[in-house]
């Protein structure tokens, strides 16, 4: 895991370094940040069975609570995550750092779902989409993530989630116990 993760992290940092050098004193454009962050991981998913196995392991580590998975991910991606979050904060001054972290987390989760190629996309799209097409995934994921970062922050007085609404929902074929 770490060997491939370090390749992704190093490529992300190299892309960010180049983008920062090109932008000079200004901040790196949001689209550039998102594309540069996502591309190395989606490229890895195309590197044969080893790349696909890495993505599955990464998805598993991300989905499991526990110190080992967190420590491995922090060791592999900690420096690149800090750099990208900092750059995203500069590119999204309308968001708090907390909001950027949340949206960054959603972006990471999205690319892991897409790159795991578990067959679900093909299933619910009726074969119209192929999760193995990483270029199509990137072309769809970049504007999706950008829209998330550009969205207004949530209202401070937003209504909380009502757990009873879901618990009381009528589900066909389900009997209350």
Predicted features by range, described:
Residues 18-22, 58-60, 123-128:
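Short linear capping/connector segments at secondary-structure termini
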Residues 29, 33, 37, 50-57, ...:
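Residue-level detector of well-ordered alpha-helical segments, enriched
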């Amino acid at each position: 895991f770490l060997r491939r993760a370090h390749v992704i992290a190093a490529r992300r940092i190299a892309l960010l370094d180049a983008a920062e050098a090109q932008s000079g004193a200004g901040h790196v454009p949001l689209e550039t940040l998102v594309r540069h962050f996502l591309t190395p991981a989606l490229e890895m998913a195309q590197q044969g069975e080893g790349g696909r196995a890495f993505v599955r392991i990464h998805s598993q580590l991300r989905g499991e609570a526990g110190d080992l998975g967190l420590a491995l991910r922090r060791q592999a991606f900690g420096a690149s995550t800090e750099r990208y979050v900092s750059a995203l904060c500069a590119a999204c001054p309308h968001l708090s750092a907390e909001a950027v972290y949340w949206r960054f987390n959603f972006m990471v989760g999205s690319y892991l779902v897409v790159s795991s190629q578990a067959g679900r996309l093909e299933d619910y799209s009726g074969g119209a989409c192929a999760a193995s097409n990483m270029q199509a995934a990137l072309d769809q994921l970049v504007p999706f993530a950008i829209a998330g970062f550009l969205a207004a922050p949530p209202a401070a007085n937003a209504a909380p989630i009502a757990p009873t609404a879901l618990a009381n929902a009528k589900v066909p074929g389900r009997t209350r116990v």
